[in-house]
Amino acid sequence: VRLVGSEMCIRDSFLTTCYAENMETQQVLLRFDNPLWNLLELAGYGLLFACCLSLSGKAGAKFRRGLLVFTLGLILLLGGMLIVFGRTVPAADALSVYNAAAEWILGNKDIIHPTVSYLSYYPQQIGLMAFLELLLRLWNLTGLSAPAWHFVKLVYVCLLCVAVLFQYRSLRYLWPDDWEPVSCCYLILVCCNLPMILYSSFVYGEIPSFAMLSVGLFLLLRLLADCIPAHSVETTFPDDTRVVGTSHALSAVTVFTALGSILFLTLSVMLRKNSLILIIAVLLVLFFEALRPGRSGRACIGLMAMAVCLTITSVGVLPLVQKCYEKKAGNTLSSGVTAMSYFAMGMQESSRGCGWYNGFNIDTYDAAGMNSDAANAISRAAINERIAYFREHPGYAVNFYLHKHLSQWADGTYASRQATLATYGGRSDFLKEVYEGSLASAYIEWGNAWQNVLYLGMLLFCIATVRKRRPGNGSANAAANDDFRFRNLCLYTYTGLIAVLGGFLFHTIWEANSRYIFVYSLLLMPYCAAGIHDGLVRLAAWRSNRTLTRHSNS
């Protein structure tokens, strides 16, 4: 499944590009790419990675640490420049949530209302509102008159650095034998990820939620590595403490690591409800890791208990936050726009693209008098109508879902320009050109090239993990072919890939938007880095083996 999915992604991204030119209509366009040009771009990236690995091999840890500092500094620099010169402001849903937080601070209790409140349509946004309320209250303490959203964007830039740092630290647990060269490839990927920089100015849930995810996943990986029985652990880290149950202190560390992982993963759901997809992946991993042969009864019970706690907290965090606000306001919120209406909308045409937002969900909720049962009935009727039409026109159905898929997974910009387009003036001429001028096509091409690298690296990683062992021949590439360590990876290594697979299936039937795929692209970066490193190692081994064969024949 991993191999087929990654092959499909690289094929679609390599042959096509989806993008938007008109920032008013934001219609998603599809074009066919020049394969030769894409190969040239991939070769350029390959040369960059090869040079990076060569320098890492010569300079060792100093180069890696320097590259980490450079990467974090680059994020801070570009993110800060985007705040100063981009002047992006919240818009659409982001503005509604931001204004709700600001109005609540001013004492407007109508923010919590069963009919007239934005939150009565989208109560899942209340967690993000609580987070923004905290940031706005902190900003108000400064007494400065500048708009608070600039401060929020600065916090987001810092959170992006946190996300990168903890994802970088996770590599040590994902690939303990090869994490140093893989980390160099990862940092190069981060440095070239321009849509990620643009999203640091998007005052919404993506960046803070991903930061919480990165911390939570790091703690999860650390926990699962520590729970491995001592007799089955081989580690190259002198300070690694993977032996379980040897002391009360270690047991306390394990418990606090588990609680920390639960806390941050729960916060990610509070900030962005779609993070539940990754939570499901984590729960699957915890369940199967608990049943893994060799686990002690204590470890099995502990992992099962963690899964139960994570289920309760991730499902209950948003209702809990909502209850707190309702108690303070002395009022209640409605149940909100139904999920069924999103599924129905995902089967319909839109001016932006197949399955994209067309207002059906909120129009249906209004037409039903904000009654969830009535809205679901209307949505089910719309779904049945589309299913009947698809059956009568199978060619249209295939074309519809093909374009829906490409509009999300073949957009290398991840709708970053559309998401951060709004401004009240003051945007620099350079960034105006990036958004709507002559540099827009260059930005689209940059994003497309980066996405091709991402999918190719993921494909190489998946090929490496399914490759059958072959008997060693003592050649220079024997280590690459015979003792390929990726084949012995634990299940928890694939948590991110499982989440991406779940997201792929979910967004095939949900409302379409390439912005929703942005977080999945960040989750794929470690796997891409590992695949690129393995591909370059195999290429170097093949060249070395070919040279030896030539010399032996001569």
Show which residues each predicted segment covers.
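Multi-pass, polyprenyl lipid-linked donor-dependent membrane glycosyltransferases
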Residues: V152-L159, C185-L220, S268-L278, Y516-S521
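Transmembrane-helix motifs of polytopic, lipid-linked glycan transferases
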Residues: L154-P176, V215, L460
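Short, small-residue-biased leader/transition segments that mark boundaries at the very start
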Residues: V1-I10
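Membrane-interface anchor segments at the N-terminal boundary of transmembrane helices
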Residues: V28-G44, P147-Y156, H403-V500
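Membrane-proximal stem/loop segments at transmembrane-domain junctions that anchor or position
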Residues: K323-G425
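Extracytosolic helix-loop segments that constitute the early lumenal/periplasmic catalytic or substrate-binding loops
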Residues: L95-S120, G127, S351-G359
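Transmembrane-helix signature of polytopic, membrane-embedded enzymes
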Residues: Q167-C192, Y494
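Short hydrophobic/aromatic helix or loop-helix immediately within or flanking a transmembrane segment
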Residues: N99-A100, S117-A146
